């Protein structure tokens, strides 16, 4: 039997794309294996959000070269954002690569693989599709009994933040028809899903460009009506598009988890303007204030970039002050990495490397203390936990997540998977809590 090995890098959008890829190659008679050495077909689904992620892809491809030399019939494919960005250059850089499949072309992957099998043909397909075709083009995903699943509601991004490659590799915003979203949610619940995360580069702008479509807040309310669904999450949200209507959903919908990821990126107006974020510091803090007023128990995470071109010590201190005010439970922090094709790549990199690292370390230390305070505060609380499966610690425990998206490991029987159970948090670790079932 033919076999394939798939490795996924990057965001939740790529996770969904990979599930579609699995469905497509299984339709050709391929079965999944755990290592590239066993595979007849190797697929990398890639991320190019930062230079490091791109380098990682080429590093992996280098390790596959000896496999291709030993087995010339082996098919190697690269999908996703690096494929979209590099296109034909990938085939030139990696002469043993067979397929380069862009973000709009996953539906064509089965045909490309079949052609590579029969004719040893090499393929590059990275053309963007028209919006109407993209809107209805979602290949069937491989079935899964996982408790928590992602559902794509919008693709692409229209914001063109100056540092971000996403609009260049994912294209402009296109909302998926709400009827299709609801149909997929129902199907996944029938397969065993109890939690659905609605995803997109900017879910808040769902439906804004389609005259016949509902708002994202209205979509949330319809998803909440699906029988058998216990929890809803969504990501990612752009602060400038976070409406009062959407914020009110946190108070109105019991199924909506009390957590939001709201990337701020910087704390000073000058840097935010240079980033083309479309909001000010005060406007961002105003959204946070309203979220907490409407839903006092909500917790927030965020993204922050340090060392953006032109950033001053004073502007960095404004970011530190914003972290103190916002009190995120966690941040995903990065030192600025210029991406080719973005407008920020043309700006002078005028901040010394050691200064960037110093700022980054200070910011990380501050946030780690805030995070530690949250985790210690939670010890002793009894919280509803959706049980997702066996703990990744490999110690026979189960794991699940709180409404705040915090991982909890605890002792319990496997028949609890898929249920929401009360768990008392007993010990706090950096990335999880230990608990005991009540």
Curated annotation (Swiss-Prot):
CDD domains: Radical_SAM. It comes from the Bacteria. Belongs to the methylthiotransferase family. MiaB subfamily. SMART domains: Elp3 (SM00729). [4Fe-4S] cluster 2 binds at residues 157, 161, 164. Residues 376-438 form the TRAM domain. It comes from Syntrophotalea carbinolica (strain DSM 2380 / NBRC 103641 / GraBd1). This is tRNA-2-methylthio-N(6)-dimethylallyladenosine synthase. One of its GO terms (cellular component) is cytosol. Monomer.
């Amino acid at each position: 039997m033919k076999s394939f090995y798939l490795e996924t890098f990057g965001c939740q959008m790529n996770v969904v794309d990979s599930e579609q890829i699995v469905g497509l190659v299984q339709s050709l008679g391929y079965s999944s294996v755990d290592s590239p050495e066993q595979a007849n077909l190797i697929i990398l689904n890639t991320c190019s959000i930062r230079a490091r992620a791109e380098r990682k892809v080429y590093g992996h491809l280098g390790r596959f070269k000896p496999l291709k030399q030993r087995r010339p019939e082996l098919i190697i494919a690269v999908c996703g954002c690096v494929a979209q960005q590099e296109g034909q250059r990938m085939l030139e850089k990696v002469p043993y690569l067979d397929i380069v499949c862009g973000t709009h072309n996953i539906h064509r992957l089965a045909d490309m693989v079949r052609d590579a099998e029969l004719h040893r043909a090499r393929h590059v397909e990275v053309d963007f599709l028209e919006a109407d075709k993209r809107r209805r083009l979602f290949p069937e995903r491989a079935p899964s009994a996982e408790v928590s699943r992602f559902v794509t509601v919008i693709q692409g991004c229209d914001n063109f933040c100056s540092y971000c490659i996403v609009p260049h590799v994912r294209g402009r915003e296109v909302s998926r028809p709400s009827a299709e979203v609801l149909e997929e949610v129902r199907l996944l619940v029938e397969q065993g899903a109890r939690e659905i995360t609605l995803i997109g580069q900017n879910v808040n702008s769902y439906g804004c460009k389609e005259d016949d479509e509902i708002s994202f807040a209205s979509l949330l309310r319809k998803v909440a009506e699906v029988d058998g669904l216990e929890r809803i999450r969504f990501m990612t949200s752009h602060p400038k598009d976070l409406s009062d209507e959407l914020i009110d959903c946190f108070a109105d919908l019991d199924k909506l988890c009390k957590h939001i990821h709201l990337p701020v990126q910087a704390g000073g107006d000058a840097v935010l303007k240079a980033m083309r974020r479309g909001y000010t510091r005060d406007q961002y803090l105003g959204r946070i204030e309203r979220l907490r007023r409407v839903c006092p128990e909500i917790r927030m995470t965020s993204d922050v970039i340090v060392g953006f071109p032109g950033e001053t010590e004073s502007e960095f201190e404004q970011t530190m002050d914003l972290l103190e005010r916002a009190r995120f439970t966690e941040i995903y922090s990065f030192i600025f990495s210029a991406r080719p094709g973005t407008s920020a790549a043309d700006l002078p990199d005028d901040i010394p490397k050691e200064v960037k690292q110093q700022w980054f370390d200070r910011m990380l230390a501050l946030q780690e203390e805030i995070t530690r305070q949250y985790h210690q505060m939670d010890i002793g609380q009894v919280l509803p936990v959706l049980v997702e499966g066996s703990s990744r610690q490999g110690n026979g425990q189960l794991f699940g997540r709180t409404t705040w998206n915090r991982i909890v490991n605890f002792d319990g029987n496997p028949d609890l998977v898929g249920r929401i159970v009360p768990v008392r948090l007993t010990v706090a670790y950096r990335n999880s809590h230990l608990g005991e079932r009540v």
